[in-house]
Amino acid sequence: MKLNTLSPAAGAKHAAKRVGRGIGSGLGKTAGRGHKGQKSRSGGSIRPGFEGGQMPLKQRLPKFGFTSRKSLVSGEVRLNEIAKVDGDVVTIETLKQAGLLVNTVKFAKVVLSGEISRSVTVQGLRVTKGARAAIEAAGGKIEE
């Protein structure tokens, strides 16, 4: 088998519909669009969510809530991800360098998910009760 001899299995590919190419094709003249009307014209499609002038569902329902600006600069790190970070000290900067947090994050919290077997020192991160217990059980410590 060579790359230049690869081809799809027989019947795996369907030929494209050639519309507007004569009566015999079954898709001649109107090309399967029917007669007249908005959808028969070129560019004649309605936008998603348009309900013919009736107030759309999106606008009939009330607005609610907001996006907290703090959530845009906060991150969450799991215990098993911390185990992948090189070095013994875990800070926001080391997490960003390891690719576990995006650069816009200013605050992060360590949550209990997975396990950690080596001892690490967590600096400047908030830690949940379960994660704190797991880190200390592995011989690590937390510095606020």
Curated annotation (Swiss-Prot):
A Pfam family? Ribosomal_L27A
Alphabetized UniProt keyword annotations: Ribonucleoprotein, Ribosomal protein, RNA-binding, rRNA-binding
Question: Which BP terms does GO give this entry?
Answer: translation
What NCBIfam families has UniProt attached to this entry?
A: rplO_bact
In this chain, the stretch annotated as Disordered covers 1-58
Give one GO term, molecular function aspect: rRNA binding
Instruction: Give the highest taxon in the source lineage.
Output: Bacteria
- Disulfide bridge positions per record: none
Q: Which GO terms describe its cellular component?
A: cytosolic large ribosomal subunit
Organism source for this protein?
Psychromonas ingrahamii (strain DSM 17664 / CCUG 51855 / 37)
Q: How does it assemble?
A: Part of the 50S ribosomal subunit.
- Entry's family note: Belongs to the universal ribosomal protein uL15 family.
Q: Known PANTHER family for this protein?
A: 50S RIBOSOMAL PROTEIN L15 (PTHR12934), LARGE RIBOSOMAL SUBUNIT PROTEIN UL15M (PTHR12934:SF11)
Q: What is this protein called?
A: Large ribosomal subunit protein uL15
Relate the protein's function as given in its record.
Binds to the 23S rRNA.
Q: Which Gene3D superfamilies match?
A: 3.100.10.10
Q: Where is the composition biased (Gly residues)?
A: 21-31
Q: Which InterPro entries match?
A: Ribosomal_uL15, Ribosomal_uL15/eL18, Ribosomal_uL15/eL18_sf, Ribosomal_uL15_bac-type, Ribosomal_uL15_CS
